[in-house]
Amino acid sequence: MIFVLDVGNTNAVLGVFEEGELRQHWRMETDRHKTEDEYGMLVKQLLEHEGLSFEDVKGIIVSSVVPPIMFALERMCEKYFKIKPLVVGPGIKTGLNIKYENPREVGADRIVNAVAGIHLYGSPLIIVDFGTATTYCYINEEKHYMGGVITPGIMISAEALYSRAAKLPRIEITKPSSVVGKNTVSAMQSGILYGYVGQVEGIVKRMKEEAKQEPKVIATGGLAKLISEESNVIDVVDPFLTLKGLYMLYERNANLQHEKGE
C-alpha cells in the first residue's frame, strides 16, 4: 500500500493506493505549527478508522508547496512509518520536459498534475487547478510542459472582499439563485462565482488561441465541480488528479530504483 500526501497552502490531501486504486482519501487543514508527533497521531487515527496501520504502508510520496512543513512531515514518516519518503522536487524522475525559463520555479503540485494529466488524458492539455491560487498549465502535443497562468484563488478573492470592505460579510462559495443578487450575500456570491467562470473561460480561450490548438481542459481542486457546472470550456473534472499523479511518480521512481538494483 502506498501513502500519498499533497500539501497545499490551505489544505493537505492524503490518500492510500492499493494495487493502483485509490482506496481512501482525507483532507485536513495545513498547519505549519504541528510537530511530527502531532501529524503522526493524526495520520494514525485516520488509518485506524479504515482498519489500517503504519505497517500496511510500504512506500510514501510527498508533494508540498509549503516548505516550512516538510521537516515535520519527513520526520513523521521516518519515525512512525519507518520509511524515508520520496519528495517531489529536484532529483525525482518525472519524465516531464519542462519549458519554463527556470524549471525549478514550477510548483510541485503543477508538475504532479501534468504527469497525471498526460498519462490519463493525453495531449495537448490545459489543466486548471482551483486551489489557494488557481493555476492553468499548458502541455503541448509533444507532451512538453510549456508554462501557464497563476491567479488568486476563489477563496482569496472572497476573503479580500470581506477583509478590505468594512460592510461586506464573509460568505459561503455557492451558486446563487440568480445572477442579479437581491441582497448583499447573493450579490457577492454571484460576483465571485460568475466572475471566476468568466476568468476561466477567458483565460482558456486565450491559451487556445495562442497555442493554435484545441487541447482538452481538465479541472481539479476543491471548487472544480462548482465552476465546471457553470462553464462550457471544462471537459473533465478529476478531483483526485494530484493524488493519482503522486502515485504514478512513486511507481516510476520505485521501478527505476529497482532496475538500478538500489
Curated annotation (Swiss-Prot):
It is an enzyme of class 2 (transferase). K(+) binds at residue 129. SUPFAM superfamilies: Actin-like ATPase domain. It comes from the Bacteria. The keyword DNA damage does not apply. Disulfide bonds: none annotated. It is found in: Cytoplasm. CDD domains: ASKHA_NBD_PanK-III. GO terms for biological process: coenzyme A biosynthetic process. Substrate binds at residues 100, 107-110, 184. Its cofactor is NH4(+); K(+). Its main location: cytoplasm. Its EC number is 2.7.1.33. The active site is at residue 109. It catalyses: (R)-pantothenate + ATP = (R)-4'-phosphopantothenate + ADP + H(+). Keywords: ATP-binding, Coenzyme A biosynthesis, Cytoplasm, Kinase, Metal-binding, Nucleotide-binding, Potassium, Transferase. Belongs to the type III pantothenate kinase family. Catalyzes the phosphorylation of pantothenate (Pan), the first step in CoA biosynthesis. Homodimer. This is Type III pantothenate kinase.
